[in-house]
């Protein structure tokens, strides 16, 4: 969510890793196929787009705008779904404020705990491309852990 500079690095990298990428942003000047060639671009509010797209256990949601008007509805929709990954750009202070806002919207502590924020692996990333690599690394890690859990042998209690 957010047709921003980090998304311009993240989208093609994720496509190279065989993710089906959709960039969602209601701002028509930002969310264009010229800025995001080769990926699906949706010019709608994220919660409305998610309703149409459907979120499921194979979905990762990343918010990148720093704008609560855009990010919070997307996070709320993602946290009320079964997506395997939810990440939000921003500092620890921004993340704490986000937690307060989403709590007021009815998101529980348990639900909010699913948000990776600050987003990405802590690799000292600075540039948009480096931040994109750190985000994708975290998404790949989350996907691998989810698959491990699904494939783990089930032990029945006696």
Question: What are these model-derived regions, one by one?
Answer:
Residues 1-57, 68-71:
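Hydrophobic, well-ordered beta-alpha structural blocks that scaffold small-molecule cofactor pockets
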Residues 13-14, 36-38, 75-78, 101-104:
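Short, glycine/charged-enriched secondary-structure capping and boundary segments
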Residues 18, 38-39, 82-83, 111-112:
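A generic structural signal for alpha->beta connector loops
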Residues 24, 60, 65, 76-101:
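ADP-ribose/adenylate-binding Rossmann-like module
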Residues 83, 89-158:
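Adenosine-phosphate binding glycine-rich loop
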